[in-house]
Amino acid sequence: MTQRIGLLTLPLHSNYGGIIQIAALSAFVRALGLQPVLLRKEHQKAGWKRMVIEVLKRLPGQNIANYRNQYLKLQRHAAFMEAFLPEQSRVSRSPAELRMECDRLGLDAVVVGSDQVWRLDYIDDGAYDAYFLSFLVGSPIRRVSYAASFGTDRWPDASRVEDVSRLLAGFQAVSVREDSGQKLCADRFGRSDAVHVLDPTLLVDRSFHEEVIATLAPGRGESGLYAYVLDRSAAKKAIIDAAGQSENLSKITIAEPENDLAGYVDLGEWVRRFRDAEFVVTDSYHGMIFSIIFEKQFVAIGNAGRGLTRFKSLLAQLGLEDRLVEVGNERVQLPGAQIDYSRVNRRIAELRMKSRAFLSDALDVEARS
């Protein structure tokens, strides 16, 4: 009988990287001959608040607290989710509801990750411990983390260290996305065996992302310089302009602001823009990853507010530290040398082999008997 593997990540909203990374993880789990199931965890809120939010999502002519736009953006990913996401559970909001879903679905293991699932300010809704799989304490269901990220290089709440340490002690296998997370696991939570692995978007082959484009956005897109910048500023615009001049690219496409619903594209088009660009400037972690996947010359602008550690960790693994520029420096120096992707791809292949071996071994339920 095919083993059923629950996947727990942050709630699916309009974040491109958050959606495509769980699809990639699902694809790899399926390639192992296992059956992935997406565990739908939403933030805990009082019943009346949930009712108000549902009304705001569907009520045209307003965008109070951005609920309407977020809802409409997620609708644009319907075709992607239908094609690339696995079977989904019912929505759960508490650890108790998640436990009931795991039992109902007959899961053999639960994998938490990837993305910033262990970043406390992202998960502290009164049930942060769900992302440390508290709902599986006392259950025979196997507990694994894959490329879980703390988002920063420190844990902000000393009062919860003991609780998190106790929960992580019950995991059969722990892996994290950043080297700083590996250090946190060892120094703060007693898991010196935590493994540093690749983001799921790098775990799968490039062919997975080409399939996304072929399914949702076939054909060719814009060439030239593509700027995918989440947090805009005059300093970042200066970097974009400098990159355009340096690369002698007069054609510059700047992605629409995140709050611009009219210009919000589906995932197929989003991925295609990286594939078809000649040069990329981005302050997005997954924007940086897709620049690497499609072998683009790029500049990554440090995004401290959204988590700078993850940029530095991956770039260091690949020997691409010089591609990171940080706004605030008196003078930004753009990298001069071209990226040697034959070397980078060899390194990715090594890390991919290690990451695949970790997850394959972690999900080998037969090994428990």
For the regions a protein language model found, what residue spans apply to each?
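Active-site anion-handling motifs in enzyme catalytic cores
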Residues: 1-369
